[in-house]
């Protein structure tokens, strides 16, 4: 003799097992969107320390810069979060490439955090040695500008370089698995070499890092990351052989032995 579970419980169980990867898709998509929400305001907020060579000896806007550094740290964490959320899914397509994607995101986050720490050091110098004059002021300015230069290099080698490798690895995984419409990873795969071109041109001084040419070359990768974030957040994954198969029995009424 069996007792059939209530309909509400059955419906809940069916809904919970219908799409076991939905939470991974939503989490990854939200992390990708948070990258834009955090990185763009961060770049604006840290503007004073980046563009004022005398920031360390002047009345710096420390609170504003600190908020920008905090958002940059959030940006680094979202990179790690997206990789952690996607790995259990994309490893079903190719484990080595999935590990490569996680590694590239971790490296990107680490480089970003180095830049954050360098700007925090500038703020600390300004607060500890405010009002210094003469040789002390000159030394502070040289030190602070060196730290800002360090941050600029991390920006080039982190957000300026690693997204190209991310696009190649994740774009290939998503294209082959068809977890999202193929047009989305195609944009990333096209944009990756363009971003690498922009990075190398900037590295060797052919173009400025903040220029119209650099902006055009980086746009496809930005479009890829934004579109894949939107799709995974609101649509989830497209049915694919790499997704786990749901046993139809899991969606039926739950039977319990009679007492």
Model-identified regions with their sequence ranges:
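Hydrophobic, aromatic-enriched alpha-helical segments typical of multi-pass transmembrane helices
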Residues: 2-259
């Amino acid at each position: 003799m069996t007792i059939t579970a209530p309909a509400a419980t059955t419906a809940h169980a069916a809904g919970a097992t219908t799409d076991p990867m939905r939470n991974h898709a939503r989490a990854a998509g939200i992390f990708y969107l948070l990258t834009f929400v955090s990185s763009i305001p961060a770049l604006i907020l840290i503007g004073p320390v980046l563009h004022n060579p005398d920031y360390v000896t002047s009345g710096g806007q420390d609170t504003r810069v600190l908020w920008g550094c905090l958002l940059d740290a959030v940006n680094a964490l979202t990179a790690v979060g997206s990789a952690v959320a996607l790995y259990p899914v994309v490893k079903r397509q190719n484990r080595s490439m999935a590990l490569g994607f996680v590694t590239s995101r971790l490296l990107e986050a680490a480089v970003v955090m180095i830049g954050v720490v360098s700007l925090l050091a500038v703020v600390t110098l300004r607060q500890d040695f405010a009002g210094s004059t003469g040789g002390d002021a000159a030394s502070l300015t040289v030190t602070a500008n060196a730290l800002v230069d360090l941050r600029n290099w991390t920006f080039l080698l982190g957000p300026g370089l690693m997204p190209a490798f991310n696009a190649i690895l994740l774009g290939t995984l998503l294209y082959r698995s068809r977890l999202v419409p193929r047009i989305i990873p195609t944009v990333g795969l096209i944009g990756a070499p363009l971003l690498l071109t922009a990075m190398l041109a900037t590295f060797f001084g052919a173009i400025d890092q903040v220029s119209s040419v650099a902006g055009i070359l980086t746009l496809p990768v930005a479009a890829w990351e934004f579109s894949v974030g939107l799709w995974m957040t609101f649509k989830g994954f497209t049915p694919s052989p790499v997704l786990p198969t749901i046993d139809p029995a899991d969606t039926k009424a739950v039977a319990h032995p009679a007492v």
